[in-house]
């Protein structure tokens, strides 16, 4: 793969790699996405079109970073998974706040801007929850999603129809205002 592609394999091949992950505002992918968001907002704002933006939940980001190995990590090294989820939760909040700053930039914000996200609202994809038992979601997903919701005020959840067994756990989350289940 060339230098202009995003990763296609898990970044954390080794657990020790977690310590090298940084939230770097100068990261080229972070800068490119913020630039693209800024461009979109500037060009759609005059038409009052909302820019919807959802984010990985901490559990989904942890899976993207670790891959399928996270499922054995649940059993073999839950302490590592919690460290990874703590990083993923901080990364989700950091990234979503940066995106909200672009979406709600002075001069471009309008009443429809906060369709899915904003300074006080966040939408999270909980796709990986459908591959977890309710008890695993309760331990590894919910506490970190709750911290993200608490950081923003209101939360929305997106999940897939393969995961209705986890919906009762979603309903226990404080500040959740919407659950979107898609096929």
State what each model feature region is.
Residues 1-19:
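A contiguous, low-structure linker/loop signature
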Residues 2-4, 22-183:
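Active-site loop segments of alpha/beta catalytic cores
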């Amino acid at each position: 793969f060339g230098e202009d592609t995003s990763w296609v394999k898990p970044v954390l091949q080794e657990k020790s790699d977690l310590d090298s992950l940084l939230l770097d505002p100068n990261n080229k992918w972070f800068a490119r996405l913020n630039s693209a968001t800024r461009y979109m907002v500037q060009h759609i704002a005059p038409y009052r079109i909302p820019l919807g933006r959802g984010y990985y939940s901490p559990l989904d980001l942890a899976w993207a970073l670790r891959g399928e190995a996270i499922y054995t990590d649940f059993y073999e090294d839950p302490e590592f998974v919690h460290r990874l989820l703590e990083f993923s939760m901080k990364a989700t909040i950091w990234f979503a706040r940066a995106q909200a700053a672009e979406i709600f930039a002075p001069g471009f914000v309008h009443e429809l801007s906060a369709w899915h996200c904003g300074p006080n609202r966040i939408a999270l994809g909980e796709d990986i929850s459908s591959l977890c038992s309710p008890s695993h979601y309760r331990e590894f997903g919910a506490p970190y999603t709750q911290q993200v919701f608490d950081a923003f005020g209101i939360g929305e959840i997106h999940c897939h129809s393969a995961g209705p067994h986890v919906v009762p756990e979603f309903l226990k989350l404080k500040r959740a205002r919407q659950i979107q289940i898609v096929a």
